[in-house]
Structure formats: structure tokens, C-alpha cells
Amino acid sequence: MAVPDWKHAADVVVIGTGVAGLAAALAAHRAGRNVVVLTKADQRRGETATHYAQGGIAVVLPGSDDSVDAHASDTLAAGAGMCNLDTVYSIVAEGYHAVTELVGYGARFDESIPGRWAVTCEGGHSRRRIVHAGGDATGAEVQRALDHAADVLDIRTSHLALRVLHDGTVVNGVSVLNPNGWGIVSAPSVILASGGLGHLYGATTNPEGSTGDGIALALWAGVAVSDLEFIQFHPTMLFAAGTGTGGRRPLVTEAIRGEGAILLDSKGNSVTSGVHPLGDLAPRDVVAAAIDARLKATGDSCVYLDARGIDGFASRFPTVTAACRTVGIDPAREPIPVVPGAHYSCGGIVTDAYGQTELAGLFAAGEVARTGMHGANRLASNSLLEGLVVGGRAGRAAAAHAAAAGRAYVSKLEPVTHHALKRRELQRVMSRDAAVMRNAAGLQRLSDTLAEAPIRHVTGRRDFEDVALTLTARAVAAAALARNESRGCHHCTEYPDTAPEHARSTVIRLADDQNLVRAEALATVG
């Protein structure tokens, strides 16, 4: 075992500073544990997916015409038979408490009248239950409030988590790279809240750090991941000619359709007419697939979101308005050009509803986790809800585990040979073979390409991210190849129908040689 350049000890290590990470860290801190938060970002308040979330938080408000049953029913319908019923009800029922706790941190939501939150509707919801802030800047307000509350925490910037350390039975820390070199943070509890994997693709709504790090860390630790074939492509990502082939692109929030905007093709025809009873407000997987099919049929580069009928658009949706104006579009006068874009991973590290994985002391929360909340397709505005609820639960559970486990000791760190494709090449083959529509031949071609990735020596963040992306891509391809049907976010041209016998999750693990990925039946966690 190499001698580390530095060492540190904590009770709980949290990796990530978005909604789930900070909710977890604050909960563990309130429980009296010594918490260290690691972020690979180079500034205290780094770029997170939470910050860019526009729509809002889906929550059942007391005294409304809504109910936990109704919200759960909508979530289950969107999840296409793949949600965990108990998890869904558990998280939805705790939503209002989690949001009021966020208000206690200083978050302020838009009001319809003084003292009453304004609510809107989004795709797949049967009620107006989406609370929002700043019109379409909810995520920024959630992040602001959590960042303010997190001033009490020990947050380490430019700290890249390389491996979760364990003895095969329990966690004992994290291997980390920072500007001072390679080091170890020993801890009996580790919480992965590192976000998503959008940069598997050339165009995504995700921030630059969404490179599948948590999925790779879990696989290297021998922990199961599941449902990775269900990658949600948001139907409406802003399209502008000449914006390049890669990187983050602005989201055009679903709430705009909730307020009456309609999707049209270049000839003025409805994109979703006859596709789903909810039309433009159908679940995201349905709308994204409809747009993708229309673009393939017409050869057009984009479809259009016509929001000209919405009064006061600029004040209701200032974030979208600003993004549109940046590329010379005035939403009040012309339709907004949009395309589907990689947005959210419905699957992830297998956990229970409290963030516990199969490895004692390892927890996961937020987009990186697969709790069973989202199934095959996430319902709009359920992500911030899950991050708040499960993040808080994971923090409390990690604190309790740390108190019971006592001090952690790192025994040894086995060397690992890493492989990675170049980022642009990886994104090209993923966008070609594992995007909105897939087929078996393309997925096999993708798997073969990924298997031939050359050795990459990790000397910094970019190398590590490419390694993590490549391993995550292999897991996505393996999961997609194992699903011989179309369901939720997974659309397979050879199998266009949903097969009841396939209403089960596919688990992916790393083989003992740390090289091959295999699929197996899902085992119950917790």
C-alpha cells in the first residue's frame, strides 16, 4: 500500500454539495457527528444540478385538494411499473415536513397570496402541487438556502473522491486527491451524493461535474447499481444552431407546458396529439420519445414550444427568458426551439428508502441513488423532493452508524488498472447508441467499443472523470442490453411493447477481476 501524502479523520464523509449532499451533511451535523463534506469543485459553493433545477418541488400541501395517495399514484404511473410502492408513499408523505425544514433554513417560495404558496402543474401530475421560487429558479433558491445553512460545515473544495475504502464488510473511509496530493479520509460512514451522469452524452442539462463518479465508486466498492437503462431525456432542452456538440445546455422547464404552452413541429402540427391522453403534459419519457420520432420523420433539427399565449412570460419564467435571449430568441414573440437532452438518471446505487446500501456504512442519496422512487421514469419535480427527504434520512442513519461503529481504520488499498475512452468519443458513441431510442445491435456495438477502452493513468480530475464515465457507460449498456422491451425511459426498436414479465430491475455489479460488468436479478436491500 502506498503511503498517503496526508490523512484526516471524521465520523461521516459526504461526497457532494447539492440538495441531497447538504441535506445529509446538515442532518449528520445536527446529530452531533464530526462531518466532512468533499466536493471536486474548486469553489466553496460549486456548480450543482440542484442550482439549475427550474420547475419546483412536488409536495402535497395541507388543506389543498391534493393527497399523498394522489401524488403517489401519479409517481407510480410515471414509473411504469418499476417503482417501490412503500418507498414512494414514504417519501411523498414526508415531503411537506422536508420543505418546511428547508424554509427554516431560509428558503422562500413564490406565493399566490401572502402566506400561501403558489403551485403549478407539470407533466404527469393530476394536481397543481409544484411549489416554486423566483418563477423558474427554484433550484437556485434551494441551493442558496442550503449553502447558507452549510456555513457551519467543514466543506473541502478541490477534493476528488477516488475510492470508497472498506474491508469487505464495513466502510472505513475514502481515498481522495486534492492539491496537496493523494490522501485518506478515514470514517465509518460515507454518503455518496455526487449527482448524475449527464455527460455520458454530447448534450445535457447537467452541470460539468455530472460524470457518473458515484456509480463508479459504488461499483469499485462491490456495491450493486440498478435501473441504469432508465436515463431520462428531458423533452425540452433549448436548441440553438452553432452551440457546439457538447456540454451543458439550458433547460426549458416543464412548467411552461403546465401553464399552457404547446409543442409543435416545423409545420405547426402538434407533436403529442394522439400519443397520450395528457398530450404535451404526458410523462417525460412519452414526450421525449414523441419528439425524437417526429424529428426522425421530418429530418428537422428541433421542434418548437409555443408559449406566446402565456401572459407575463418574462416575469413568470425569467431564467428561461434570459437563456432564450442569449441566443436571440424572444419567447413572447416566437416559439422556442427545443430538443430532448440527457437530464436525469432514474437508476443508480441500490439503497433502501433511508439511503443504506448493502455495504455497512455506505449510504447514497439524490440522483446517484436508486431508492425505487422513480422506477422507469421520474415524475417531474420529484427529484428535489427525494433529495431533501432521503438526504436527511441518510444523514441521520450515517450519524447513528458512526456512533455505533466507533473510529475507522484503513487497512489496505489495492491498486486498480483504469480504462477510459476520450470524452468526446465516449459522448459520440453513447449519443449514437444509447440515447432516446436504442436497438440491440447498437448497444452491442457500444459495449464492444467500451470494452476496448485503453488504459488511463489517473493524474487529475479530467482523467478520473473519463474513467468514471467509461465504467458508468459500460454499466448502462449492460443494463440496456438486458431489457428486451420498451418501458419508461428505455425505448428499444426491436421490442416496442412493454412486457409484464420484465417488470423487474436489472442489477449490475463489477466482476471479481474489476473488468467485466454483469447483469443479475435484483436482491432486496435492507
Swiss-Prot record:
Residues of the active site: R284 (proton donor/acceptor)
Record-level Gene Ontology MF annotations: L-aspartate oxidase activity; nucleotide binding; steroid dehydrogenase activity, acting on the CH-CH group of donors
Keyword Cytoplasm: yes
Residues that bind FAD: 17-20, 40, 49-56, 213, 367, 383-384
Gene Ontology CC terms, in alphabetical order: cytoplasm
Gene3D superfamilies recorded: FAD/NAD(P)-binding domain, Fumarate reductase/succinate dehydrogenase flavoprotein-like, C-terminal domain, Succinate dehydrogenase/fumarate reductase flavoprotein, catalytic domain
Keyword tags: Cytoplasm, FAD, Flavoprotein, Nucleotide-binding, Oxidoreductase, Pyridine nucleotide biosynthesis
Highest classification ranks of the organism: Bacteria, Bacillati, Actinomycetota, Actinomycetes, Mycobacteriales
Localisation per UniProt entry: Cytoplasm
Annotated metabolic or biological route of this protein: Cofactor biosynthesis; NAD(+) biosynthesis; iminoaspartate from L-aspartate (oxidase route): step 1/1
Entry similarity comment: Belongs to the FAD-dependent oxidoreductase 2 family. NadB subfamily.
Highest taxon listed in the record's lineage: Bacteria
EC id: 1.4.3.16
Name listed for the protein in its UniProt record: L-aspartate oxidase
Cofactor details (free text): Binds 1 FAD per subunit.
Encoding gene, per UniProt annotation: nadB
Record carries keyword Transferase: no
Obligatory cofactor(s): FAD
Residues marked Important in orienting the L-aspartate substrate (site): E122
Single biological process term from Gene Ontology: 'de novo' NAD biosynthetic process from L-aspartate
Catalytic activity: L-aspartate + O2 = iminosuccinate + H2O2
